[in-house]
Amino acid sequence: MINKDFKRRRDFLLNKIEDNSIVFLFSGLEKSRNNDVNYKFRQSSNFFYLTGINNPSMLLIITKISSRHSTTLVCDRPNDIDKIWHGQLPSKSSYKKEFEIQNVLYFDELNSLELNDAKNMYFEFADENRLNQFIENLNLSQPQSRYLKNNTSRSTKIDLSNLIFDMRRIKSKSEVSLIRHAAKISANAHINIMKSCKSGLKEYEVEADFI
């Protein structure tokens, strides 16, 4: 996939949502296995479908207010500990350039949301608690925070998953090409396994050939 494909998907979603709407889409979260060891990270399929980004703890916000459209990626501010354990993370300018995202902010920089005229809120209903916590933690003044919560409670809630599922049912030419390529790799791997199988082999020996 090239990054223009992800941009094209975001534009398609923008055309599908109603006017005076705001979209919230969370990335996956890292999950602790034990102590300071996490399970291998698995990105949210829908977040990856719209961004191509494979990092945790991020939020994509798309607004369609009257004639004003905007796309904002929100992420954690990198620190020295992150650099030690995960290496150099992309900068805000890197995200903008590489993934063609209009605005990139750190969570602690997000001090306003264009919700004044947002009559509809699209988000994955499974992430409702995360969305409520995000709004609760926004760095807003007390009047702003009170207004935002009141306006949020009045907005029509729409499950974003249904829209994205409809989009994902129809594959682009590049997606079809990738699926065919993956199927060919899998088919060749199974053929090689069948050729190498013989009496007395243990399962782990067959698996080693597959890997």
Predicted feature residues:
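Active-site pocket-lining segments that scaffold enzyme catalytic pockets across diverse folds
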Residues: 171-211
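A composition/biophysics-driven feature that prefers long, compositionally simple stretches
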Residues: 1-188
